[in-house]
């Protein structure tokens, strides 16, 4: 199960496709890929 946009990604949870965990805020943000 992946984390959607702006979903919390602390604790080793992985973000969904084209998303990356923001190190400072600890939520999933777009990685600028398509």
From Swiss-Prot:
- GO molecular function, a single term: sodium channel inhibitor activity
Pfam families named in the record? Toxin_12
Source organism, top-level taxon: Eukaryota
Q: What positions are modified (Phenylalanine amide)?
A: 34
Subcellular location(s): the record lists: Secreted
What does its PTM field state? C-terminal amidation is important for the high potency of the toxin.
Question: Which cysteines in this chain are paired by disulphide bridges?
Answer: 2-16, 9-21, 15-28
Task: Explain the purpose of this protein.
Answer: Inhibits sodium channel Nav1.7/SCN9A with high potency (IC(50)=117 nM) and Nav1.2/SCN2A, Nav1.3/SCN3A, Nav1.6/SCN8A and Nav1.5/SCN5 with weaker potency. Also inhibits voltage-gated calcium channel Cav3.1/CACNA1G, Cav3.2/CACNA1H and Cav3.3/CACNA1I.
Q: Which family does it belong to?
A: Belongs to the neurotoxin 10 (Hwtx-1) family. 54 (ProTx-1) subfamily.
Mind telling me what this protein is named? Answer: Mu-theraphotoxin-Df1a
- Source organism: Davus fasciatus
Question: In the record, what lineage is assigned to the organism producing the protein?
Answer: Eukaryota, Metazoa, Ecdysozoa, Arthropoda, Chelicerata
């Amino acid at each position: 199960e992946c984390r959607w946009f702006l979903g919390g990604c602390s604790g080793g949870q992985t973000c969904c496709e084209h998303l990356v965990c923001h190190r400072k805020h600890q939520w999933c943000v777009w990685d600028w890929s398509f």
